[in-house]
Amino acid sequence: MNAQPFHNNTSDVQSFQDIISNSYQKPLSLVDSTDRALPDSSLSSLSRSTFQFHKHHLSGNENPQPSSESPYFTNNERLNSSSFPQIHDNQLSPSFNTSYQAIPSSSSNRSRGGPYTPSIRDDSLLALLSFSSNHRLHSMPSQLQPFNNASSYTTPMAPFTASFSNKVSHSAYPTRRLPSQAKKTSAIERVPVNLNFLQSDNLVVQSSPQTNFENFEFPKKIPSKEDLETREVLLLPPQTSKLSNKNLDTKSFTDVNKISQQGFVEISSNSSKVTPNTSLHQSFGIASSSSNNYMQTSSELTSSTEKMNGSHPLQLSNKSLLSIHLMQSKNQGHVSMTGSDKLSSHVQSETENAPVSKPSKPNTLTEDEKPLQSTKLPGNSLTVGELYQEPKSIQLPELSVSRTTYSAQSSSVKNCNERIPSAKALKKQKHLVPENKSKLQYVWQKKESLPYANLTSASNTHFFLSENQNDTSERLTRTLRKSTKNYTFGSYILGRTIGTGEFGKVKLGWPLPKANSTIHRSTPQVVIKIVLSTKQNCQTSRLMREVAILKGLGNNHPHIVKYLDFVKTKHHFGIVLDYVNGGELFDYILARRRLEDSVACRLFAQLISGVAYLHSRGVVHRDLKLENILLDTNRNIVIADFGFATTFGHFNTLSEHSLPTEKPDLFSTSCGSPCYAAPELVNCKSGMYAGTQADIWSCGVILYAMLAGYLPFDDDPHNPNGENVPRLYRYICSTPLIFPEFFKSKARDILKKILVPDPAKRVRMSAIMNHAYLRSHVSLFETYNDDEATSLRPSPIRLLSQKSLASVSSVSSISTYSSSIELTPQITKTSLNREKPALHGSINLKHSTRPVVPIADGIYASTTLHPIDNAKNRLVSLLRRPKHKVKHAKVETRESPMKNKPTKKQHKRAFSMFERPTSQKAPLSPVESKINLMVAPKRVLNCASDSLRALLAGKTDKSFWGSRIPFLFNKLKSKQKAVSSSFNTENSFLILQAVSPLTFGGCFKEENAYGQKKQHMRHATVF
């Protein structure tokens, strides 16, 4: 029999007699208890479901007597019935569209006085409940006065729990009377009773609000304690989102003192005090999870019971997605999620006919007590309706889902919608590019995309999709699977971009599971350097050379980046390297301003060990700088970026391009960063330089930067950022090395031997490893830099001429170069050594197309520095000395600056911007510089702007300067008049520092010069 939903379209409250007479007899169902209030539409949304009442366990020869002709039971049938009949079997399965819970309980015949069991399908109570959920009665009918003196029976919505006896002589629950028997009953028998205020010594009632039980029969006398044998029955009325505690009229209660937060009221029979029952679900061991409107699902609750006197097996059905756990105890049931979409309920008892004791205090589940999955007993299962197919279950291995609990007051449809992720939100969570191993295995081993569902309301292992959502889920799955093609590169998953440049991109990656690769990967993450392969240009050649060098070096040294694989696709080449997650050494120094001597010594020893290992393998890096030195998790050095690296000596097999020189490591390519590169790269007259000595110079610059926090030769006032490369290297060659005060003696000594402009006088690698500064790290050199251990190995360049077939991975159809390299033409040494652009986007040295312009005396701008497009935006000027800690450097090996006479060369270098040919008698005007500070020993210089300009123009007199520093005027004036090419500087000492070339305009005030903050202040020139 199909249930017809109950609709109330009238504004007035209809009589309960009309509601009962027009209602159908419907089977009662027990449903789950949820904290979330369902909307009003939930009363009629679930159209077909199957419910089944199981036979009551009887004693003796009592047999059930079902009625097959009529679903109604008359009063005579009820009187003659002494057992609990089965209302309908599997063939006759009427459905009822509701979420109510019934009150099947034992009762007694009022006329005979003998016990009998409820056996009818009565929907009058359900109709009244549905009616009362839409109509609130604020006044008590006059018929209720004999039972209760309360003025109103509007109580908070709560589950209905009653304890009745099996041995009572009268009916303990409301039953419907037929119209033919209504005349035989007296008026008092037809008086409706409000169970909310039914009080007795032995009866404890927890009822629902807004319930009127008109035309129901109740026992004339209340049984005593001796006649009672309690049994628990749970009723959950419909909870709508429209009802809340704020709408309750608490003033109308006469005996109510407290109302619980969940709206559950427990009425005690011994006193009129009403105590709240805040954990009703917990007392029955029920823990329910909230459902959502988007999960159009049907869960099935099956129940199985052991032989237990007076208990009914429960079968629950609802459109909500449930997660129910019943505590496993002596007197309570146990419900747990099974592997499928069904739930099983098991009632445990010690003996077969043991009586059920009264409910004890509510127990709470601890974290260690997890409900075990129980098996489903036969004969106790049912299907979900004809309109709803079997819910589909998708298992999520190793995917943790957090479950959110909601209280009864705050749970509503609005809150539910806010917590439901949309399809776009799921895609934005980057499930396809997971950051951990568990999600990675789920996405790529199971080959399943995340469906459109609310994972917060599902269990930890399963979530369910109804048939209505199959189409949406399949479309989303196809969309997500299609988008995964853009996230793979060979047998690797591409992640975020961590670096860009002219050559291409550097991306994070993860190896796909089940990939046929014999390469040992120390970490699950890798770094993939991707270069376009559409054109056979110098970038591709450099990439192939880098692959050959890294493959020839092997993964034997801990301070050199590890090579893993080479991938070739239709349009790209890629080098797969080990991921170093500590960042660049540049950022590490910049965050700490400078490093301690012990830390810098340890990092420098690791750097020297790695570079010495490269040299022993015949490899020159040629681009050592702070940006190419990485740090791992333990803050250890890892040398990376071999874009400029090349080979030399007996490792070079290209004999037709070999150099007939005594030194096999001579090169002619001007590469690398200017501030780290050795000066012989530009100033060498022969055009050749030693690659090993150039790497040693770069190591010295890195050590100086770690100790000081800034670079040693980047403070030229006329070339602040080293844009003019020839002038930069001239400045390096002609400027003595000055150290800060906090440098230790051993660090100064090793830097003096490394940072020598002449490569012939520069210290060798073996002498550096034996220096006293690195004496505490000798064990590192003995392990990885032993001369006997560095035996000759096959040349890395020889691999460039070897061609072999590429191994094809079983996971992807893209060729993966795991053990061999395939290159087209043979790369000559000229192409390896003469190409200017770098793969990593470093500074590119190019000849200027503009005419040669003289910058200063003897210096011409014949070569300028141009950064490559899209190069890394990082200036060396970030590493500067702190402005608030500027101190003059101490001049070593000189007791007094005034006693030592500097040479003419030093004087000309200090005043090169003011020198003019002696043949020109025009006055000197400072048009290219702006003096920042002029300091004399133990004197303070204070002068006006006109005095300074007159001094520089040669139109000065002693009156401008007074008697403070007359020697300065005399010497400058004699220099301007060209009295002699060299003059006596015995009494003069001047430290001049400039900021930047700037046209002198307007009136120059010396007080402004004193107030300016100096950008850098390192070099001191003495004359």
UniProtKB/Swiss-Prot annotation:
Ranges in a coiled coil: none
Top-tier EC class: transferase
Residue ranges, annotated region (Disordered): 55-119, 285-314, 333-381, 883-906
Keyword Transferase: yes
Biased amino acid composition, Basic and acidic residues: 889-898
Gene Ontology molecular-function annotations: ATP binding; protein serine kinase activity; protein serine/threonine kinase activity
Pfam family, one: Pkinase
EC number: 2.7.11.1
Active site per UniProt: 623
Any Gene Ontology CC annotation: cell cortex
Binding sites annotated in the UniProt record for ATP: 498-506, 529
Polar residues composition bias: residue spans: 60-103, 294-314, 333-365, 372-381
Keyword rRNA-binding assigned: no
Reactions mediated catalytically: L-seryl-[protein] + ATP = O-phospho-L-seryl-[protein] + ADP + H(+); L-threonyl-[protein] + ATP = O-phospho-L-threonyl-[protein] + ADP + H(+)
Family: Belongs to the protein kinase superfamily. Ser/Thr protein kinase family.
PANTHER family in the record: CALCIUM/CALMODULIN-DEPENDENT PROTEIN KINASE KINASE-RELATED (PTHR43895), SERINE_THREONINE-PROTEIN KINASE CHK1 (PTHR43895:SF32)
Protein name, as recorded: Serine/threonine-protein kinase ppk1
Species: Schizosaccharomyces pombe (strain 972 / ATCC 24843)
